[in-house]
């Protein structure tokens, strides 16, 4: 079903379906089906953004829509340049006059000239990109602006919750947590790392952790890549955390923690199962609302796969511990050594009086390769996660990790495979070789290219287009692996190229260890039928968009719901699940996330797009990360990557183009949103 389009100005075109019944003016590039419902039974009445504006049937008056938009533009302007700082004010004031019935007294030609100056002279995207709607309205629908009758005002629209907006950018939309990247970069440029950290703490407490191991989807979307290279966003995030010199747990004081948010019943208890990124972030947001939380963790330390699956040369243990302690700082409790399915079941928790449960149990079970006649008990044949866990647990013993006495072959080329091969390199006997074999080409490898580069620098060999055929075992011990060369097929209709074995190309790599790092899955044995938890055909927990499961009061997120993904996605889902749990405990109604829905519209309508620079920019080299010498670092567990200096961070932050875009929609009915605000929380 499509919404009935009325009129608008979109991508430089005047569109008007009001004058004739059979008019066929339709916006090009905007999927009208997205306007049919913002949330259930609630169609859009307008869309406004850098491309212009679209008005659908039963919409507010155009002046009201524009006034709301430019009031937002004024508040989102960084204020660093006159065209945007003053232009948004002048446009908003003109539209206020129009809303109040004085549109005929406004010099709209002068307002158009102001908007044109904004469009070419502003320093950031708010000014550069927000001029188009008013220019289109003045050029094509001036009669609407010159109204002499007062119309429903801005506050009426916003108070009725029929207006949803966001100031966003490619990096923000690419980040699953929708972190305001340009804002924290601004603070770093201004020498205020504590404020930069504050921006990040609005989303998650694992700031230094994410600043070290995030897979950086924001950088892949950074508009600066069209000029030379993306901003070093992850390094800047780490800089903010490093400059403070303390973990996020030490940034909160008791005065901020003791008052529940409005509508919160402090007697309602929540159990979070799993102290990984999703569970910790879920607990963090619930605790900040004043809700009691207990976190059940089968290990003796918090962090989940960030603690046990990421080696300390990438993520120092003290850094992670200083951030996972936030749960205790905020009044929550860790219950270590308690595993779901072994020590308790869901019914036990509910019988103990917990009002809601969050399942953040991750995907901690590795997979074997599965070739014919595979001996999974062969000595030297390991699953990747088992190997990493064994090494991590042995780090705290006097003996340390057990040396690997022979060559090692790692199968797979994801980030877990990179952690496995680089960990093996640190404990293998001198003179032994570590090899990575992957069935596709290097460009198809899911691992971070930086990790592949670092592994190569440490002397690890790669065999691409090579797939395992059988593991060679003698007397119960691995002695080698047989691989077969693969070749790429011609691209299919979608452009994808498959790989197929090359007949007669088999070869053997003698080795004492084969580590299978080809993926992980959730351990289904933690559940019993009485738990009532439905699983997908992929073996993950079946959830809805609001993170509810098949059992009332039980929610799930992170890898347990998505399959093995990324730390940043797990944290984003932990935050969203906390909001959903909060809504459930207040009303027993399902939660709806307006910002998430707006992001879906932004993506499908390509409202942000590639954001190529509109003006020539000087070539400015990206910050170059500093690493320990490969030969020296491969013999120890010290953190490999160094930190930015204050001056390096300042210079890198100045490369940010702040390519923000303001996008808004109005709806026919109120949007029932759920965005709880923690009491006494600082605003950044």
Which residues fall in each region the model found?
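Redox cofactor-anchoring modules in respiratory/redox and cofactor-processing assemblies
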Residues: 1-159
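Local cysteine-cluster metal-coordination motifs and their immediate loop/turn environment
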Residues: 71-93, 116-135, 164-183, 205-227, ...
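Glycine/serine-rich phosphate-binding loop and adjoining beta1-alpha1 elements at the start
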Residues: 177-179, 189, 193-259, 328, ...
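Beta1-alpha1 glycine-rich phosphate/pyrophosphate-binding loop at the start
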Residues: 179-183, 188, 230-233, 272-340, ...
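Glycine-rich dinucleotide-binding loop and its adjacent helix/turn
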Residues: 241-263, 325-342, 366-427, 535-550
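Feature captures the FAD/FMN-dependent oxidoreductase FAD-binding
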Residues: 264, 268-273, 321-371, 470-482, ...
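FAD-site-proximal beta/loop scaffold in flavoenzymes
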Residues: 377-405, 471, 491-564, 611-613
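A conserved FAD-binding loop/helix module that cradles the flavin
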Residues: 560-591
